Amino acid sequence: MFLNEITIVITTFFSEEKLIKCLKSINGKCKVIVIENSKNNELKKNLNENHKNVECIVLNENSGFAKSNNIGLKMVKTKYALILNPDTILEKDALHNF
């Protein structure tokens, strides 16, 4: 599978430390959409500065896991989408085996 055909959607709520580890395991290999439920604009700033493959949407309220994932999925423009939790660490070739 070509990594440019996958967008990863991650819903978070004050999970920056875990999210950064997750993003490192993705290693900039495909597009990522982060939906942050905590009004944490600092997270968005950090991601914009340090992770060029990541788009962060900060919601005005905690919309919950399902609704937030649906918001992220509506933004996906690739053939495939993969929903991850922020504490997920991908194995080295996990995306190649998707």
Name the predicted role of every residue range.
Residues 88-98:
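Acidic donor-binding/catalytic loop of UDP-sugar-dependent glycosyltransferases
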Residues 25, 36-45, 61:
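A conserved acidic beta->alpha catalytic loop
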Residues 59, 84-86:
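Catalytic metal- and UDP-sugar-binding loop of GT-A-like glycosyltransferases, i.e.
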Residues 12-28:
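Short, well-formed alpha-helical segments that are part of the catalytic scaffolds
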Residues 18-20, 40-49:
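Acidic helix N-cap motif at the loop->helix transition within catalytic regions
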Residues 59-76:
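Glycine-rich, basic loop-to-helix element that forms the pyrophosphate-binding segment
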